[in-house]
Swiss-Prot record:
Role played: Forms part of the ribosomal stalk, playing a central role in the interaction of the ribosome with GTP-bound translation factors.
Subunit text: Part of the ribosomal stalk of the 50S ribosomal subunit. The N-terminus interacts with L11 and the large rRNA to form the base of the stalk. The C-terminus forms an elongated spine to which L12 dimers bind in a sequential fashion forming a multimeric L10(L12)X complex.
A GO molecular-function descriptor: structural constituent of ribosome
HAMAP family found in the cross-reference section: Ribosomal_uL10 (MF_00362)
Cellular component GO terms, alphabetical: large ribosomal subunit
Any single Pfam family the record assigns to this protein: Ribosomal_L10
Protein name: Large ribosomal subunit protein uL10
Source species, domain of life: Bacteria
PANTHER family xrefs: 39S RIBOSOMAL PROTEIN L10, MITOCHONDRIAL
Family to which this protein belongs: Belongs to the universal ribosomal protein uL10 family.
Keywords from the named record: Ribonucleoprotein, Ribosomal protein, RNA-binding, rRNA-binding
């Protein structure tokens, strides 16, 4: 019996180690006062955004953190902790959780986060949630880069367009 428990714990540590190894960002939450249906709703919203969510056993989470480059996050594992993490969009865990908390008046509390190999405060998580997604930022950059090119094309086409208008007017004048 003890051996089965040890094997299950090792599997849990290995899975969490893998999750921490690929996570670019994470948000830690205190889930006290959250019922199962609300927790399921949170997981669904996070999954739709490509974000993983795990309820953690603190001792196993500390062991998993020791197995990765993120051993400095062990301080976040106190009390009932769940972790939302993403390997793709750095902003997604913070944005989805903060939107959910503000829209549902949930008892879920953000206790901190992890970004760029350091722990961040609740205030920094809130600021991170306000940032636009990666796709929006890329489109803004591309629009900014495209704007001068479009202007240049309009300027270069201006004389040709003007010549075409003058020629069209001359043709009408000769016909009529």
């Amino acid at each position: 019996m003890v051996k089965k428990i040890r094997i299950k714990k090792k599997i849990a540590v290995d899975e969490l180690t893998d999750a921490l190894a690929v996570a670019q960002s994470a948000v830690f939450t205190d889930y006290r006062g959250i019922n199962t249906s609300e927790l399921t709703t949170i997981r669904v919203k996070l999954r739709e955004a490509g974000v993983g969510y795990r309820v953690l056993k603190n001792t196993l989470a500390r062991r998993a953190a020791d197995n990765t480059d993120h051993s400095n996050i062990k301080g976040a594992f106190e009390g009932p902790v769940a972790m939302a993490y993403s390997s793709n969009d750095v902003v997604a865990p913070a944005r989805v959780l903060m939107d959910y908390i503000s829209s549902s008046k949930s008892n879920l509390k953000v206790t901190g986060g992890y970004l760029s190999n350091k722990l961040i405060s609740v205030e920094e998580v809130a600021e991170l949630a306000k940032l636009p997604s990666r796709e929006v930022l890329i489109s803004k950059i591309l629009a900014g880069m495209q704007s001068p090119i479009t202007g240049l094309a309009m300027v270069l086409n201006g004389p040709a367009r003007g010549l075409a208008i003058v020629l069209q007017a001359r043709i009408k004048q000769l016909e009529g």
